[in-house]
Swiss-Prot record:
This is Efflux pump bik6. It is a multi-pass membrane protein. It comes from Gibberella fujikuroi (strain CBS 195.34 / IMI 58289 / NRRL A-6831) (Bakanae and foot rot disease fungus). Keywords: Glycoprotein, Membrane, Transmembrane, Transmembrane helix. Efflux pump; part of the gene cluster that mediates the biosynthesis of bikaverin, a red pigment also considered as a mycotoxin. InterPro entries: MFS (IPR011701), MFS_dom (IPR020846), MFS_trans_sf (IPR036259). The gene is bik6. The keyword Glycoprotein applies.
Amino acid sequence: MNEESNMGGVFKEEEAQSGDVVDFEGDSDTHNPQNWPMGKKVYTTALWALTTCWITFASAIYSAGTAEISEEFHVSYEVANAGTSLLIFGFALGPMLWAPLCEVYGRKWPALAPYFISAAFAFGTATAKDIQTILITRFFAGVFGSSPISITGGSIVDIWTPRQRGTPMVCYGITIAAAPTLGPIIGGAFIASGCGWRWTEYLTGIVMMVQFVLDALWLDESHADVLLTRKASRLRRSTGNFSLHAKWEETSPTFKSLLSTYLVRPFQMLLDPICLLLTIYTSFVYAILYASLESFALEYGRFRRWGPVVSQLPFLSLLIGCLFAAAANIFNNIYYGKKLVANNFKPVPEARLPPMMVGGFAFSAGLFLFGWTSVEHVSSPWPSIIGVFLTGVGFTTIFQSSLQYLVDTFTRYSASAIAANTFVRSMAAGAFPLFVWPMYEKIGIDWGSTIFACISVLLLPAPFLFFKWGYRIRARGEFSKLSTY
């Protein structure tokens, strides 16, 4: 598809608005992404979700081959395991660059160009001749592959109205949770079949390249300011009226100024109690998701002596828990929709929190159950697998509700709030796999999981606090007071 078809056809000269400011023309203007046909909105959301899915899949599939990498290159397991952590650390740094790029050049190519480079680095990992190459290529695969992670949320906001976007955001969010649970299972199958760890990376590069081609062909630009700027430029050429312009061109932020904003403001927002507390909570549950890469391998692989594929199957229980929680979040959108209508279609952040309030208890219970039904205490694996399911339920409800609450609370500053959240949670998730294995070996899965469960209990009051006093807290915040209307 060319850009003209992406824009929905040739612009008409009479589309220029009064005052020489070019804008969309109401609900009938198909150039406005929020007026796209439902089918186009659905497949666009699906493409963005899959694009994000494969890079989060890449973050986890590597773990299945860690032991082989350690043996082949004669390094410790901890050094080989750093390949997982370095890619996730790349997730923390990349959005600081890609987010401002998308504000200047739109959503599509600032996401896809780095994504292509990330896929190339996956092939670099697959053909590596030493451990240094593996670690370097994994890190840069994370930096460049993080582009859709930082941009997809904005794309969904571009094309769905506030009342509609709850379900698409849940469906997108589940890809962040589901892909890391499938990665170890598929990776374990490659290892068990004798293909070796390199084919886990070849597979990653192949699926990312295929996704890149699909996106290049079928994804359309959706950033309203960029679309209106292009429209104004086209009208200036066709009419000769060079005073025509988009509202966004009156300020024309540069990439340098946006880079400064995206580097500084996210850390300023961490001083806000809402952003800080929810970032701590989401970072912890996200880190536990990646800690599972090690804890499951230890519990089901080493201690229960299951094979390389079977030992990864408990991730299916985690996935089922995530899907169950996603359904609960979608159901909560009915409640949210009623609150939105009652509030004159202005966001009601606190209406996002009920799933999180319940899910927090499931998360804590799951961690306790996993730890105290480990092989040292219970011979049957099923109680611990039920604990894994509850952990999945809790993770998804906490993660998705928190991000939706941040978007509704910080409105025009939501991108910075999400950037701060992404940075902190990625740093935490990258760090956990480095120490979970030695910690569990030293104090046991039971006490290790108990420590994590106790931390989660300390965080339980957060959604209740914001549900009751969130409006007052928002009204006092420099960045959140705009959501109090």
